[in-house]
């Protein structure tokens, strides 16, 4: 596994005074000497506590976990490997070796699978349903069974992170990273980990409905360039289905009750036609994307061949 001297532990935080001290201590006890706490402007003393326990503390320029991660890696980390965890005490520092080991085996990104060993009470039933639905949807769109794309326990090379196109500000950062890894064929491993219940006295910053909606929208938005057939096809299918249902309603009203609905009939035809066009556009976009990827593969192969000749 990577030498500890080549690893920075990244802990994005916001008002985690109840847990950050023990979290930093655990990673220091695990042998890490560079622990970066990237704080989003905590008002409960998180920064002071982290500093007292030996962490390097930086305040991000704006709010949100996504901004914290991007700013930390791009501006405050220069080591080759990054081990990222939450500062809420739900991840075990003693499992750092399992997280880092795949990076020595050719993988560039590692995701900790919380569902492999989840402590009772660590995740609400609503959050479990949302996580499972997100993971299922991700696998359908991107064809990669990453198991737990919303996990906050990650290990990755700094070089691979710099290749990702990331823009999410909040909790959508994990989804965005997973999508980018799948899109760019970055070798990604999934490692079973233990997920603990939050320590008593600490409060989560996650809002299930609000943040869940943001995550779903981010996942769907990213499908536009990763799987356009799904993106346009799903909208087209919905539009076409709506048009067909309207047509059935108009037909029944006309033949059974003799009531005409000319305006609804026009709307039905328009909705159905739009649906068909969107599906066709999705098929064409998917074809163009496949051709684009083939061209990129050829260019990379030629570059490797010429590089070998040198």
Name these PLM-found stretches.
Residues 1-26:
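N-proximal low-complexity "stem/linker" segments adjacent to membrane-targeting elements
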Residues 40, 83-87:
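Active-site acidic Asp-centered loop
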Residues 16-19, 42, 65:
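Donor nucleotide-sugar binding loop of glycosyltransferases
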Residues 39-47:
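A conserved acidic beta->alpha catalytic loop
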Residues 25-34:
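Short, acidic, metal-binding catalytic loop of nucleotide-sugar glycosyltransferases
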Residues 2, 176-310:
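Hydrophobic helical membrane-anchoring modules
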Residues 58-76, 81-84, 93-171, 175, ...:
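Acceptor/aglycone-binding surface of glycosyltransferases and processive sugar-polymer synthases
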Residues 89-91:
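Acidic metal-phosphate-binding loop of nucleotide-sugar-dependent transferases
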């Amino acid at each position: 596994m990577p030498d500890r001297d080549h690893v920075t532990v990244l802990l994005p935080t916001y008002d985690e005074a109840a847990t950050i001290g023990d979290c930093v201590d655990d990673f220091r006890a695990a042998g890490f000497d560079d622990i970066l706490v990237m704080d989003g402007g905590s008002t409960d003393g998180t920064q002071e506590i982290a500093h007292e326990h030996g962490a390097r503390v930086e305040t991000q320029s704006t709010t949100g976990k996504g901004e914290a991660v991007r700013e930390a890696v791009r501006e405050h980390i220069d080591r080759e490997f990054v081990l990222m965890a939450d500062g809420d005490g739900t991840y075990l520092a003693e499992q750092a070796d399992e997280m880092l080991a795949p990076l020595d085996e050719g993988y560039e990104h590692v995701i900790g699978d919380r569902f492999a060993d989840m402590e009772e009470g660590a995740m609400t039933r609503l959050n479990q349903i949302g996580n499972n639905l997100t993971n299922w949807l991700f696998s359908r769109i991107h064809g990669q069974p990453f198991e737990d794309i919303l996990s906050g326990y990650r290990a990755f090379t700094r070089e691979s992170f710099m290749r990702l196109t990331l823009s999410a500000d909040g909790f959508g950062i994990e989804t965005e990273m997973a999508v980018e890894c799948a899109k760019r064929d970055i070798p990604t491993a999934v490692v079973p980990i233990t997920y603990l219940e939050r320590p008593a006295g600490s409060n989560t910053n996650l809002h299930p409905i609000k943040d869940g909606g943001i995550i779903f929208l981010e996942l769907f938005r990213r499908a536009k360039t990763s799987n356009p057939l799904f993106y346009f096809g799903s909208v087209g299918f919905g539009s076409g289905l709506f048009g067909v249902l309207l047509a059935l309603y108009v037909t029944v009203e006309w033949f059974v009750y003799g009531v005409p609905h000319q305006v609804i009939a026009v709307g039905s035809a328009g909705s159905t036609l739009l649906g068909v066009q969107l599906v066709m556009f999705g098929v064409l976009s998917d074809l163009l994307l496949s051709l684009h990827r083939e061209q990129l593969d050829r260019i990379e192969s030629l570059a490797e061949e010429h590089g070998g000749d040198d």
